[in-house]
């Protein structure tokens, strides 16, 4: 599993002109899944992201987590993160989980996130989404599980 974790001032996901997920101050997480990903991977990733100290404390040091700042969490599935770009001029997606497995893993992630973090929003697996964000910092991390 590969995730892009972005600290945002605000973010939203639109599908066909309708907003399906929106947060203010918080985290936008783009998620790509591999065939060998499991529920355990998802739990580890979610725990790390929610508790990762990337928000500034009063002295300006990155010392606070999403839970500490009571921020929003916006989860967006993005299978293109799993692209192999080493050869040629066209990406290969052979490293990505199948659409069926990817949907199952994303649904599990969303369910777990909603149970442990009240302000959780999401995009829609398999949809053509427009993602709007105001990156705060910018602060962006690439996490692999």
UniProtKB/Swiss-Prot annotation:
Q: Which residues form the signal peptide?
A: none
Q: Which InterPro entries does this entry report, sorted A to Z?
A: Daa-tRNA_deacyls_DTD, DTD-like_sf
Q: Name one GO molecular function term.
A: Gly-tRNA(Ala) deacylase activity
Where does this one sit in the cell? Cytoplasm
KW tRNA-binding (keyword) present: yes
Substrates-to-products reaction catalysed? glycyl-tRNA(Ala) + H2O = tRNA(Ala) + glycine + H(+); a D-aminoacyl-tRNA + H2O = a tRNA + a D-alpha-amino acid + H(+)
* UniProt entry keywords in alphabetical sequence: Cytoplasm, Hydrolase, RNA-binding, tRNA-binding
Highest rank taxon of the organism = Bacteria
Q: What is its main location?
A: cytoplasm
Cellular component annotations (GO), alphabetically ordered? cytoplasm
The UniProt record lists the keyword Lipoprotein = no
Short motif Gly-cisPro motif, important for rejection of L-amino acids, span: 137-138
BP term (GO), one: D-amino acid catabolic process
Give the Enzyme Commission number.
3.1.1.96
Q: What does this protein do?
A: An aminoacyl-tRNA editing enzyme that deacylates mischarged D-aminoacyl-tRNAs. Also deacylates mischarged glycyl-tRNA(Ala), protecting cells against glycine mischarging by AlaRS. Acts via tRNA-based rather than protein-based catalysis; rejects L-amino acids rather than detecting D-amino acids in the active site. By recycling D-aminoacyl-tRNA to D-amino acids and free tRNA molecules, this enzyme counteracts the toxicity associated with the formation of D-aminoacyl-tRNA entities in vivo and helps enforce protein L-homochirality.
Per the similarity annotation, which family is this? Belongs to the DTD family.
Q: What is known of its domains?
A: A Gly-cisPro motif from one monomer fits into the active site of the other monomer to allow specific chiral rejection of L-amino acids.
Assembly, in brief, is: Homodimer.
Q: What is this protein called?
A: D-aminoacyl-tRNA deacylase
* Gene source species: Legionella pneumophila (strain Lens)
């Amino acid at each position: 599993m590969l995730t892009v974790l972005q600290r945002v001032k605000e973010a939203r996901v639109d599908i066909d002109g309708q907003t399906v997920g929106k947060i203010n101050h918080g985290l936008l997480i783009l998620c790509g899944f591999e065939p060998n990903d499991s529920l355990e991977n998802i739990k580890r990733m979610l725990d790390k992201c929610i508790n990762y100290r990337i928000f500034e404390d009063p002295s300006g040091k990155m010392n606070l987590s999403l839970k500490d700042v009571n921020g929003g969490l916006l989860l967006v599935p993005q299978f293109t993160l799993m692209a192999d770009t080493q050869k040629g001029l066209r990406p290969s997606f052979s490293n990505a989980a199948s659409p069926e497995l990817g949907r199952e893993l994303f649904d599990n992630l969303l369910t777990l996130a909603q149970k442990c973090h009240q302000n959780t929003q999401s995009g829609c697996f398999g949809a053509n989404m427009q993602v709007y964000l105001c990156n705060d910092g910018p602060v962006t991390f690439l996490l692999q599980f």
